[in-house]
Design a protein with these regions (language model features):
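Active-site-proximal inter-transmembrane loops
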Residues: 123-131, 185-211, 215-218
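Non-catalytic, topology-defining segments of multipass membrane proteins
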Residues: 1-177, 181, 221-248
Length: 248
């Protein structure tokens, strides 16, 4: 029994230090893929349709790793496009300043996600099944708590660090970097009626969301790359899903 307890404390999976780093990067990348493919391109913009298998997987995974509710995220993002760079934009660095969006982007998101008028006007067409009503929306915070338990069981004490990185990943890169730097630094392929910028021509770390100006120019396109030298890894994943009959 003592040996079993020690094994549990040390974690089910034992790896060298670099193995934990790689595992953390993979786990956080799955989260980013879920945000860009499921929440952003599928739910908010209807740029593609997802088969129930990846759709339910991403919903479950994002519940575990972010606690974000599909209706809330979709509504806030749609309002951002509808009111971009105005006083009604939930997270514009033009209005709030780049420092505030970079450092407090997740707080700006949570504030708008609690706005019933925003949810009513922009949250249409999002999941409203039993799972959404009774688990994902009703108990959004319990998902991240469950993820902590899973990480500790799998990886031992270092699982707490892995979990902490998972929890910070979306607020830093999605809520902060994309919503902030994506409207402040970078280059523009299109003179859109907003301050959107392409942060980098290679969209890998943030799933292709780095190509933010391209997205604002063609918001309903599932592909965010435009020039021959630009790369959108999210589009690559979508094409793979299409080949497997899991996306259209």
């Amino acid at each position: 029994m003592i040996l079993d307890l020690l094994n549990l404390i040390s974690g089910v999976i034992d790896m060298p230090w670099w193995g934990y780093v790689v595992t953390t990067l993979i786990l956080t990348h799955i989260t980013i893929a879920g945000i860009t493919i499921y929440l952003h391109r599928h739910s908010a913009h209807r740029a593609l349709e997802l088969h129930p298998i990846p759709s339910h997987f991403f919903r479950f995974w994002l519940w575990l790793t972010t606690g974000m509710v599909t209706k809330q995220w979709t509504a806030v993002h749609r309002k951002h496009h509808a009111k971009c760079e105005t006083n009604d934009d939930p997270h514009s660095p033009v209005i709030f300043g780049i420092k505030k969006v970079l450092l407090e982007g997740s707080e700006l998101y949570r504030k708008e996600a609690k706005n019933p008028e925003t949810l009513k006007r922009y949250g249409y067409g999002t999941p409203d099944d039993w799972l959404e009503r009774n688990i994902y929306s009703k108990h959004s915070a319990k998902g991240v708590a469950l993820m902590l338990i899973i990480d500790i069981i799998l990886f031992g004490p270092i699982g707490i660090t892995i979990w902490a990185v998972q929890m910070m990943w979306a607020p830093i890169f999605a809520a902060g970097l994309i919503n902030g730097a994506g409207h402040y630094w970078g280059y523009r392929n299109f003179q859109a009626e907003d301050a959107s910028r392409n942060i980098l021509p290679w969209g890998i770390l943030i799933g292709g969301e780095e190509l933010h100006n391209n997205h604002h120019a063609y918001a309903t396109s599932a592909r965010l790359s435009n020039k021959w030298y630009e790369f959108d890894i999210g589009w690559l994943y979508i094409r793979l899903l299409e080949m497997m009959g899991l996306a259209t």
